[in-house]
Regions:
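Small-residue-enriched hydrophobic alpha-helices in membranes
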Residues: 1-102, 119-209
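Primarily EF-hand calcium-binding motifs
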Residues: 105-107
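Acidic, glycine-anchored loop motifs typical of Ca2+
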Residues: 112
Length: 209
């Protein structure tokens, strides 16, 4: 995981745009994680930035593009709310942005823990971000009881949501440790993602983040 100084879980006021849960995703992404995508994704909130990257990777995969020549996501790829890459709810009936947060937190736990300072930053952002008491409790539970890959996969109602849940986990960490790599591999299998689709998602991460 990246340190706050390098943009991993560090709080950035410019990353806290959009709806409350989407803004918390912006926090988890960190300023560096969202500002590079076409120069304007921050204004849409963190969930929309993830949706744009997932949409572009999915389209490139469906169109049979080679990973090395794949089209890079732009702000034009930010999905409309309620579309398949910006769903209102996940398979559990709760806001899909909360499922993305659960996936990100679970990935951050893959190396064994989230540090006390990181937890404090997330708590503070949730408290001032406009989340209601139920949603805050939901996020706090995710911090203390992170989901397993199969539990994350159960939150996906379709392949597009599965794609986005994987991407959320991937951008939350720099998978340079065996535990992190294993987590992503297990998650991809539970989400039933094709290997070449995963490669396209990785390409969007490299190109945009």
């Amino acid at each position: 995981r990246q340190s706050p100084a390098s943009g991993g879980f560090g709080i950035s006021s410019s990353a806290l745009g959009g709806v409350a849960a989407g803004g918390l995703i912006g926090l988890l992404l960190g300023q560096k994680k969202v500002r590079k995508m076409a120069g304007g994704a921050i204004g849409y909130g963190g969930a929309a930035a993830l949706g744009a990257l997932a949409f572009r990777a999915y389209q490139n995969w469906q169109n049979g593009q080679q990973v090395g020549q794949a089209t890079t996501a732009t702000v034009a790829d930010v999905p409309q709310e309620g579309s398949r890459f910006a769903p209102v709810n996940g398979a559990d009936g709760r806001p899909f942005a909360l499922a993305l947060i659960q996936s990100m937190i679970a990935a951050a736990h893959a190396d064994g823990h989230i540090g006390a300072e990181e937890q404090k930053q997330i708590f503070e952002a949730a408290n001032r971000g406009g989340l209601d008491a139920e949603d805050k409790a939901f996020i706090f539970d995710a911090l203390h009881n992170p989901l397993s890959p199969d539990q994350i996969a159960a939150l996906a109602g379709n392949q597009e949501q599965a794609t986005e849940l994987y991407l959320a986990a991937r951008v939350a960490i720099d998978p340079d440790q065996p535990d992190e790599k294993a987590f992503l591999q297990h998650l991809a299998r539970w989400l039933n993602l094709a290997d070449d689709l995963v490669s396209h998602l990785e390409a969007q991460v490299r190109q945009n983040l």
